[in-house]
Amino acid sequence: MESQLQSIFEEMVKTEIIEEAFAGMFMDTPEDERTKLISCLGAFRQYWSVLPQESHEQCVQWIVKFIHGQHSPKRISFLYDCLAMAVETGLLPPRMVCEALINSDSLEWERTQLWILTFKLIRKIIGGVDYKGVRDLLKVILEKIQTVPDTVSSAVVQQLLAAREVVAYILERNACLLPAYLAVTEVLKLYPEGKLPHWLLGDLVSDFVDSFRPTARIGSICGRCSLLPVVNNSGAICNSWKLDPLTLRFPLKGLLPYDKDLFEPQTALLRYVLEQPYSRDMVCNMLGLNKQHKQRCPVLEDQLVDLVVYAMERSETEEKYDDGGTSQLLWQHLSSQLIFFVLFQFASFPHMVLSLHQKLAGRGLIKGRDHLMWVLLQFISGSIQKNALADFLPVMKLFDLLYPEKECIPVPDITKPQSTHSFAMTCIWIHLNRKAQNDNSKLQIPIPHSLKLHHEFLQQSLRNKSLQMTDYKIALLCNAYSTNSECFTLPMGVLVETIYGNGNVNIPLPGSNCMASGSITPLPMNLLDSLTVHAKMSLIHSIATRVIKMAQAKSTFALAPALVETYSRLLVYMEIESLGIKGFISQLLPTVFKSHAWGILHTLLEMFSYRMHHIQPHYRVQLLSHLHSLAGVPQTNQNQLHLCVESTALRLITALGSSEVQPQFTRFLSDPKTVLSAESEELNRALILTIARATHVTDFFTGSESIQGTWCKDILQTIISFTPHNWALHTLSCFPAPLQAFFKQNNVPQESRFNLKKNVEEEYRKWKSMTNENDIITHFSLQGSPPLFLCLLWKMLLETDQINQIGYRVLERIGARALVAHVRTFADFLVYEFSTSAGGQQLNKCIEMLNDMVWKYNIVTLDRLILCLAMRSHEGNEAQVCYFIIQLLLLKPNDFRNRVSDFVKENSPEHWLQNDWHTKHMNYHKKYPEKLYFEGLAEQVNPPVQIQPQYLPIYFGNVCLRFLPVFDIVIHRFLELIPVSKSLETLLDHLGGLYKFHDRPVTYLYNTLHYYEMQLRDRTNLKRKLVHAIIGSLKDNRPQGWCLSDTYLKFGMNPRDDNPWIPDDTYYCKLIGRLVDTMAGKSPGPFPNCDWRFNEFPNPAAHALHVTCVELMALAVPGKDVGNALLNVVLKSQPLVPRENITAWMNAIGLIITALPEPYWIVLHDRIVNILNSPSLTSETEWVGYPFQLFDFTACHKAYSEMSCSYTLALAHAVWHHSSIGQLSLIPKFLPEVLIPIVKTEYQLLYVYHLIGPFLQRFQQERTRCMIEIGVAFYEMLLNVDQCSTHLSFMDPVCDFLYHMKYMFTGDSIKDQVEKIICNLRPALKLRLRHITHISTESAAPPPPPMNSGSPAPQPNQVPVSVPLTVTQ
């Protein structure tokens, strides 16, 4: 090939001798030149036509090499003309020629003539190259330009500019050689933000990059760096808060010149989240940290160190380290965070200690030194045995810095808990020394002189064999010697013996035949807080081992109350999770179950029901799954255990947080049976109500009509197959629409009341006619026989006032599990009986008999009967009768009211502060004994049956506490039926005090007001009553100002039907300000300090958000007005809102308004419509300017030139940033129905793009269907504007954004829809957008995966979408 080409091209450049002799004087005419070119190309054309396809590229490269080997500029010029003609006549492909030219090794800037001629040729033919080829050429050209040095002779600058002209042509917007979006990607790869472009390109490149700043802003959330989340315990995290784990930057889509602050590390965001108690799961989610992969995260390490330094600064200003003070809470939290992140190796202990030393050096911060050493001791004592001594030695460097004393530090008062912190450094030294001895290390660390007195005191205490619990000496010894088993056994032995009891004294527990070991006083929280994590782990391990041993030994004695209470308290420490709650759920429970130790199982379930706080949702759902499998085991078919299992399951189901339901149940989609009850209709109904509430509060179903394709479809279908049932219309009407549709489709035929009555009469006739006792017992207790026996007992009592002994025997034989079905039927039968009752005397008799069945004969417990009644699906009048029965059962006799009032009066919900719970518990049970084995009936039958049932130990529970989750359900049922409102008020008046013991009273109130917003809109008195009853029940146990604002308590709590209180702007500003101050960590904060470990909410911000929402929903003001008032806090000029902090206020409004029902936040859509219709966006003559300045909130705000459109834009972004995907999914509906018809101008179009552009990423990740609808709507809107405008000034930013959308989000998924729209646009737009659809027709090859993280698994309501095209294509 080479020889043929050689001869062809040498022939081309052959000249006569005379021409060479007079080279500068001979000149061809243009005609001669052309003739020569054509004749020369003829020979080549012939050769090219027979050349195989695969040799084309090699051939072109040889030609270029041949040309570049020439030395005569004239010859090169002639050959380049030949190449140009070959391209123009279609002989050679332009892309191949350009690539060969630019990639030639001979093309160097020093050969200026060749450089000029080459780039002129490229400029001439590049127009024929496809856009992908142009992109590749741009990349190589930019790299080639990089080879030009920073300093060159001015003589050659002109020649070098030929390359610049080619770049200018490629970047020329009107030429449209390639999407400008792809060009800027290449430019920014070579010259990222902050790096200057090559001097040859200078302003050309920087101006081009600047032209993309509007596109970058369209894709950015206003004030994003100031937006902060509220940390919840659920671990659920929205993609909005993800950060790069190496740089802490936001993961921005596409290479665009985003605002500088978006490229900065978001240390403030991570620091804020780290400061929040119970935030570790969110931190892991934000940074993508996985516990299974031990990966050090230096940025996290730095923030932890900074947080410790901040705590040291705080300690310097605080007068004293008081119990429950801000400083104590901060150090407590820091200790927990440090252990977690260092334990899972996300942070390195020695690195952190050295970094701390560096940051504290020369600062003189020593007031907090003991607390710092206490935090370090936590980790050292627990891990020094498994790690090298060298890892811990940097602590001694820190000691030298923080303990400069020359004299001995005196021994502190050891009756105070903080004395354990004062001893922390001495304890560290003892552990280090012990490690050095064990490792036979030559390195001996002498005791520092300043710690001598402390050390001597510990040595002396160790010699004292009779340690008392009156001071903190035991804790000190445990902390100092936890790695020295000889010394540790004594103090730990004292602690253990204190709570186990010595075995000589036994005490009775409630019920008959139940005795426990005699220790009743638990270890106080102050003492447990004073133990290191290592000591706590030893203690909890010892307790768990003891429990397992007792379970396996089938011990006749129950666990000591002190042990059970202490174990509960230890489970609150997140630092010991592996031995704590994880061991409890995955090791202890299964072992106890396997050993058939039903007493201990009952104890563990009681602990979980009444003593556990902030348990992660996956543990709770795991326990629920255990309970459902337990329910089917024959041994659990025992009255007390069955009641406990069902009661615990009910609590677990109803207590699930709205944001927890979907993530947790999605884990069981492959086998939903494990989290559902195979036989309990009530538990399955409770789960459906929880799903309805969760999907309503999170707006999961917003915009959906069906549950098809969603996570709850299989769950609902399995429930219907397990326990077929219907819902009353008044309950169903509150469900989200897709759930309503499901239950209407899956309607279950119900037995008529008439049939029920007939069957009961028939069975009763059988009862009266049968004479053989065994036959009667067999017939009525037979599995599969109609569950009507309680109806028969009722009839017996009505007719004869007594039940005979056979009745008792049948009940005993039926068994606890089967009896539930009888209670269900009995509930329906009662409604029938009361509905047909003549009233008066007969009604009183019915009520009396019903109460006797509960309190006198102990046939069914009150909580079980009320739950069954509340869960039936009666309609209309029958529903009212059902609720009437519930009210009578709860209030008519004094039995339950007395129990409630005495329990509320005598007890406190703050169990962690009590040491006499057991005494009060026993006193209550002596006064109101629980009878769970039909004892009353056994005594009353003739002849009486002597029974002494074996009770399982009861440590915490009673009928009042068991009734609380049932009461939650009862209130909801009463709210659904308007005619029974007054009855509900009466119930709240008499029993509302029970909410003092509710573990989540504010959450319950929040969920209730949110879910029933529509039902409560016009029932302001009932709303007020509900809030008053629940919040008022806690007044004696909460400090002033813990929940509702003073203004609301003063004006909102007073019923004024004629003239309801309408709050003013000041009220809303103060309410928002309270959340702003809380999130800013203001000290003292708006809310009183508390121990968050035992609080309903995990941290101050979560508490502030929920109480604020409760108060706003409780106002006697329509949701729409409240929503507008909240928006006005920043959209109107408010003297109480500081300008410099405006984004923090917008953040707070976003958090609050998105946590409220739809009527509150939907008003934002009206504000957007008002802005779009405002003169500044509809009339181009209204003002002369650049719309991107108008929409730049930050710049406008700083320049005091803000306009309502930029404020509304920033506020909308804050609201939508905090919105759930359900709330955001109204946008695709809002666009075509409301916005498209009104968008007529470019400014309006750009405003809508600015509004919605930043959220395309959320839609892509969480609901692709919505992203596709929005993508199409953007083009339809552009068509509208195009047809309504004579001139378009901002075509380039609009098109750049549409390309950004294509390459980063939609890919080819909307190609077909938008192709038709693009065809109808004006030529200039059509030219710019031609690559949007042209790209896929030109290349049939499938696109590679996106360069950013891929889209997650398809979510509900998603449709298949082609993978977004990457800008690397």
Curated annotation (Swiss-Prot):
A Gene Ontology biological process in which this protein takes part is: regulation of transcription by RNA polymerase II
Classify the source by domain of life: Eukaryota
Q: Per the record, a Pfam family?
A: Med23
Keyword line: Activator, Nucleus, Transcription, Transcription regulation
**Main site of residence?**
nucleus
The UniProt record lists the keyword Acyltransferase: no
Localization (cell): Nucleus
Quaternary structure and interacting proteins, as annotated: Component of the Mediator complex.
Belongs to which family?
Answer: Belongs to the Mediator complex subunit 23 family.
Q: What is this protein identified as? A: Mediator of RNA polymerase II transcription subunit 23
Provide the species name. Xenopus laevis
The record lists the lineage as: Eukaryota, Metazoa, Chordata, Craniata, Vertebrata
Name of encoding gene: med23
